[in-house]
Amino acid sequence: MEKMINIGNCATPIMCLLIVCSILSQTRPVGGESAFFQRSGENIVVNGGFELEKDGIPVGWSAPHGIASLDPANAHSGKFGLKYARTDRNDYRLVTQQIPCIPGKIYEASVWVKGENIKDGDQWDQGAGFCIEWSDENGKWLGGVYPPCIVGTFDWQKISTIVRIPKEARRVSIVLYLRRRNTGTAWFDDVEVVQVAPPLASIQMISPAYRGLLLTPTKGKKISAKISINREEHGLVGKPLEIISELTDAKGNSLSKGVKVLQGDEEETILQLALPELKPNEYQYVCHIRIGKKELGKLEERINVVRQVEAKVYVDERQRLIVDGKPFFPIGLYLGPTEEEHLARISEAGFNTILCYGYGVGRDPEAYMERAKKYGLKVIYSVKDFYEGTRYFPKVGKSGLELARDYVMKLRDHPALLAWYINDELPITFIPRLTEMYELIKSLDPNHPQFQVLYQIPDLELYYNCTDIMGVDPYPIPSRPIDMVSDWTSSAIKAMNNAKPVWVVPQIFDWSVYRGGEPREPTFQEKKNMFYQALIHGAKGLIAYSYFDLFKTTGRKEAPKELFEKRWKEVCEIVAEINKLVPALLEGEDVPKLQGVLEKGKVHVRGITYRNKLYILLANTSSDSLHLTLPLPDRGWKSASRLDGREEKVKNGQLVLQLQPLEATTCVLSK
């Protein structure tokens, strides 16, 4: 993603909120609709306005001499602002203050900043702003939140973010700075960090998960919903709560009802409501939250009972994408160029999906869609830049929602359209705007789902109610363990309650393209391993990042033709193998006894039965050669071979094989 370089420079994703706060119009969070969070404390920053000083140094702050100073000529309010001037791009000293945050609590942090000629640095790591970081009791860095910074010359602007301090954090600091290798002058003032309270409760629909669509017949089915309660912030610790769930028709008649009591320490629960036979119609699912006879609030969702889903593209109960009535497994690429030469190459390689950043204002989207159609490619169309204030927002005199409306109305009926891409790693502060976008597009185009990609793994649950498909983009090579892919995939599936599909963005690029330094791209074995990990842990789609980086080398220089060809050959080989697995992935049944991690976390395995065959997907994430003896679910399986035809042993109800370091493979067993 464009903004992914912040991840690499910051080394860890943002750590934020505790629970999803549903902000859909029909599922407002209980406890206040006017704001996502409410301030519940005072500013914990000492001398955030820089009015107190001693010997020219602002009280409470660590301000490096020669860079930071009080400035009476530039204050947002009061007498002083803090001036931060850097002329040496290698002088990376910071203004800091340790702040008394409570682990597990949620805070709103904000800073007013003014800038003059702030420039240079990596194009992905520029500007003036602030961050919040935390460490353990020994001072070891654990993570942080890094709001977007501002570049150039500009008057006072406010930067803010919401952050949940992880429970393991012991020291928390706020940092004022210019990003690494930037020069220029910034002024800071009115720094605030204030504890905020989330709404009382929120809801996530688990079944039906896709837009409230429930297929007939309904008798014997259940509505399932996850309810989360913020007890501590609302003074409810130790108090039993009663949750009454009910399905009503348009006239308010009760059709099914259930009651569940949450004891004083329970903060979330899964409610299930048995259904009678329902006629196709719209219904209301309501959860009342009570303490004694007093109702604290209610949560509501619409349920639409239908005989069949009419949408051209939708997500079914197995989390598969259904396109024109048939299951579809997206194998795609992020790309920039869309000339026929590139689309022909991508299609010939076996990809079926593309996601292009480059089509927006000033382009010809219809021609792009027609080219994709010509080569049999489905398009995830990006509207991810249509948020005012973001780096690539088109300044054409229209709001983001107006731009989105224009593009959706223009393209919603095109046969090449697969889904809408509404978010590329935007932080949780954008959730209200993401929800507006999601609701608008859903109302204009009920025929296509919406997709977003995030690296903020602890926060994924927060986005549950403003997406149909969740994506994650783990890029471990070279600085992180390769099983980051399986960790992120599993975490995303858990965050989506195993109810909404997760697509994974495998890494096929070299980080040095963005960061500079020594080149170190993933090897063929590493790339294949990452694809396999995603599939083994339940990904329902793969959109690799990125085609355009295959043409680049360190520092975004053009790669030699032979380097591109080598990279492309490796990617094509992986995709050819994945395509052989697609029928089993779409139509097969998982084997519970063949799911998980073996050999002390080194080998990841998934078993799928399909058409009297047993497919066993394996990924060795270690640098060791491993001799594997895998017990089979029954002794009926007699022979085994890999997808390339190599035979393996089946002995005494066990599959016996050797896995090379980082090897990923599939064994197909027959009876």
Per-region residue spans from a language model:
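N-terminal carbohydrate-binding accessory modules
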Residues: K294-S347, F451
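Aromatic-lined substrate-binding rim segments of carbohydrate-active enzymes
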Residues: E340-G400, D406-Y407, F430-P449, I482
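Active-site clefts of carbohydrate-active enzymes
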Residues: I493-Q525, K552-T554
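C-terminal beta-strand-rich structural cap/linker in extracellular carbohydrate-active enzymes
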Residues: K651-K671
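Aromatic/acidic polysaccharide-binding cleft in carbohydrate-active enzymes
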Residues: E518-E573
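Active-site groove signature of glycoside hydrolases
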Residues: L403-R433, M437, L454-L460, Y464-P476
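Carbohydrate-binding surface patches
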Residues: L598-R635, L662
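Extracellular and organelle-lumenal recognition/adhesion modules and their flexible linkers in secreted
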Residues: Q26-I270
